[in-house]
């Protein structure tokens, strides 16, 4: 055996290995204590405000944590970086479906399949998710809400924009057939094994009962927090910027909160809960953690992963940084880091098949049919995030355009979209898009041949989804990959305690929701919303629990003032003056209350004036001028809602009906 400086090759290798292990231990040790170099002790901080529990992030998880902590007797400060009525994170904007199951063991098997081999999603974690999820309904009911199983039944008319026919639905693995012959819509209906779960729905979509076109779960949480105004103080426009960890005790004492522009040291005697969402709205973090350039996001603009930066500074481990929902196939908003949310998980741009996706070389790169699973598609038997170019184009003919979301009266997905091009020929369209003309002409010709043959020789697109691109004019629309929610953050245990690099909990620091989500592996619809409840409950209760090392209240620190606006329709109405036959009404939209003044001639609407609203301009467009005009023309509030802005439309309609009801007009429906 060859010798090196008196050592055999084997001795050298073993010695090098031991040195590497020792080096790794030193690195881990250094990482777990480096935070202390610049950290203060409790006596070195001038505390401005004191509470029992500080919750950072007023979304689904933060609201739940605050409520649970208050139920345990804690005085809670709940802070959010957004202005009031823009708080809520993705919980405010999502579809409000809540993943759940009826049987704990079945839930465990399902979560195990979804974890898909992620070792850090341990059996203990999977058992916790399975058991805590079944408690969500009781928690909602205990706080005055109504929780219901909401199976999404399919029919050809309702879901014609999702699938061309039942064969495509089955092939996309999104549906199971019930014994009564109906099809039920739920994601991953073949897991935890490969058999289609006909008449046996493992995962259910629940929801908080609310009127149609309302954000039931979010409205329930916001209303509940409002009702706790003697226990939960809320601050808006107040991002937490830094955690304060005592260098001697290792306890997280509180945080620096930029309260309306003023750095404020907040002492949390019992614990801090971070529920400030993950990073999908931060372009740099998306590129860093996904390795993808040019992606966009859909959802709250405030979800920029601030908590990730804060936990890293106090020695926390990170996990699930590359776990995201997406990319979805969406058009980008011009001049924005966001994408338009249109098509949901559809892998094509039109309701019919008269379209393809191409890149700058004019060539196709994917099978444009069916649906992805929150951006995941099977590669063999493994579900993985789709690989999409950073920029590509939907190419369609007039027939396809007529069935797309870009046709007819403009909906919100069209506004400002100077990246929609129209041409009389494919060659001309290619020039306008900046796509290789020869490549695109050949691609369209090949695709049309496949349609005639009933077989896609390039990507095996479902035959029932094939329809030719042949009737001009022709259209091209820019697309990109867009992420909806991410799961990265601090690693946590089943008690929602944040773990340091040494694997031990960081004292008094907890985490809930998408920030450091338990979801590793494959994501499923409603998974994060269900998690807001069970992780919020656990984090809030544990943060509020009595502790032997609870921090003493310092002299001079004040209790936080509550800045939330409690919704009081009568008070809002009373704050406006009315003339003869004028009546004020109010109702909820997605954001602040929508307030209107309605003029009546008997029971006939003759004028509608919108007095106050905070809906997103690029979503509602001309809603607040167009819809009132249509109401006056009809003499009634019962007019069609605006496509693409149904919740704001419903809020406006409800506000007008409220004004009419206050005038004594009997409103039906």
Model-derived segments and spans:
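N-terminal secretory signal peptides and thylakoid transit peptides that target proteins
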Residues: 2-20
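Beta1/beta-strand and adjacent pyrophosphate-binding region of the FAD-binding site
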Residues: 45-59
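Glycine-rich FAD pyrophosphate-binding loop
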Residues: 72-91
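Conserved redox-cofactor binding core of oxidoreductases
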Residues: 131-262, 283-284, 331, 451-471
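A glycine-rich dinucleotide-binding beta-alpha-beta segment and adjacent secondary-structure elements
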Residues: 242, 439-519, 610-613
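Glycine-rich loop(s) and the adjacent beta-strand/alpha-helix scaffold that form part
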Residues: 261-262, 267-335, 529, 535-538, ...
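An anion/pyrophosphate-binding glycine-rich loop and adjacent beta-alpha core
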Residues: 308-435
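Active-site- and interface-proximal helix/loop "cap" or "latch" segments in soluble metabolic
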Residues: 566-669
């Amino acid at each position: 055996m060859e010798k090196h400086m008196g050592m055999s090759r084997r001795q050298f290798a073993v010695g090098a290995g031991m040195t590497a292990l020792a080096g790794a231990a030193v690195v881990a040790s250094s990482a777990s204590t480096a935070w202390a170099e610049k950290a203060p002790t409790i006596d070195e901080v001038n505390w401005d405000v004191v509470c029992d529990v500080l919750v950072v992030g007023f979304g689904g998880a933060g609201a739940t944590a605050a409520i649970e902590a208050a139920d345990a007797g804690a005085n809670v400060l709940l802070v959010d970086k957004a202005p009031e009525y823009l708080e809520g994170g993705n919980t405010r904007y999502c579809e409000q479906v809540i993943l759940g199951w009826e049987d704990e063991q079945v839930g465990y098997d399902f979560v195990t399949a979804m974890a898909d081999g992620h070792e850090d999603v341990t059996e203990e974690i999977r058992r916790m998710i399975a058991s805590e999820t079944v408690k969500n309904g009781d928690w909602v009911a205990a706080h005055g809400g109504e929780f219901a199983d909401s199976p999404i039944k399919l029919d050809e008319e309702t879901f014609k924009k999702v699938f061309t026919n039942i064969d495509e639905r089955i092939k996309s693995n999104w549906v199971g057939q019930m014994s009564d012959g109906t099809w039920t819509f739920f994601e991953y209906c073949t897991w935890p094994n490969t058999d289609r779960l006909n008449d046996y729905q493992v995962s259910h979509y629940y929801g908080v009962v609310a009127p149609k076109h309302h954000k039931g779960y979010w409205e329930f949480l916001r209303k509940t927090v409002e009702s706790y105004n003697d226990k939960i103080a809320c601050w808006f426009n107040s991002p937490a910027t830094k955690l304060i960890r005592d260098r001697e005790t290792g306890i997280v004492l509180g945080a620096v909160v930029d309260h309306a522009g003023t750095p404020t040291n907040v002492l949390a005697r019992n614990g801090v809960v971070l529920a400030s969402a993950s990073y999908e709205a931060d372009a740099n973090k998306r590129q860093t953690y996904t390795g993808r350039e040019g992606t966009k996001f859909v959802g709250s603009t405030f979800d920029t992963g601030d908590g990730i930066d804060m936990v890293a500074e106090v020695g926390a481990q990170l996990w699930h940084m590359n776990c995201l929902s997406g990319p979805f196939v969406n058009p980008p908003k011009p001049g924005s880091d966001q994408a338009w949310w249109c098509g949901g998980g559809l892998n094509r741009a039109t309701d019919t098949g008269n379209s393809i996706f191409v890149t700058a070389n004019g060539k196709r790169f994917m099978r444009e049919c069916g649906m992805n699973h929150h951006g995941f598609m099977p590669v063999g038997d493994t579900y993985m995030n789709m690989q999409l170019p950073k920029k590509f184009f939907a190419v369609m003919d007039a027939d396809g355009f007529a069935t797309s979301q870009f046709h007819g009266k403009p909906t919100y997905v069209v506004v400002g979209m100077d990246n929609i091009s129209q041409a009389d020929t494919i060659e001309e369209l290619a020039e306008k898009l900046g796509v290789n003309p020869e490549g695109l002409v050949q691609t369209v010709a090949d695709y049309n041949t496949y349609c005639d043959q009933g077989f896609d020789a390039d990507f095996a697109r479902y035959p029932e989804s094939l329809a030719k691109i042949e009737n001009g004019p022709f259209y091209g629309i820019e697309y990109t990959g867009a992420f909806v929610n991410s799961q990265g953050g601090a690693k946590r245990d089943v008690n929602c305690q944040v773990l340091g690099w040494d694997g031990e909990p960081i004292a008094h620091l907890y985490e809930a929701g998408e920030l450091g989500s338990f979801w590793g592996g494959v994501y499923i619809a409603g998974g994060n919303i269900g998690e807001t409840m069970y992780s919020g409950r656990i984090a809030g209760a544990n943060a509020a629990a009595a502790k032997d090392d609870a921090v003493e209240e310092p002299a001079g620190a004040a209790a936080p003032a509550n800045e939330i606006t409690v919704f009081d329709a009568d008070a809002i109405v009373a704050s406006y003056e009315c003339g003869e036959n004028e009546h004020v009404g109010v109702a909820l939209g997605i954001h602040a209350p929508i307030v209107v003044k309605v003029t009546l001639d008997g029971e006939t609407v003759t004028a509608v004036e919108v007095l106050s609203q905070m809906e997103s301009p690029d979503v509602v467009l001309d809603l607040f001028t167009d819809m009132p005009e249509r109401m006056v023309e009809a003499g009634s509030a019962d007019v069609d809602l605006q496509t693409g802005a149904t919740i704001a439309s419903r809020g406006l309609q409800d506000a007008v009906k409220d004004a009419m009801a206050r005038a004594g007009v009997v409103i039906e429906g």
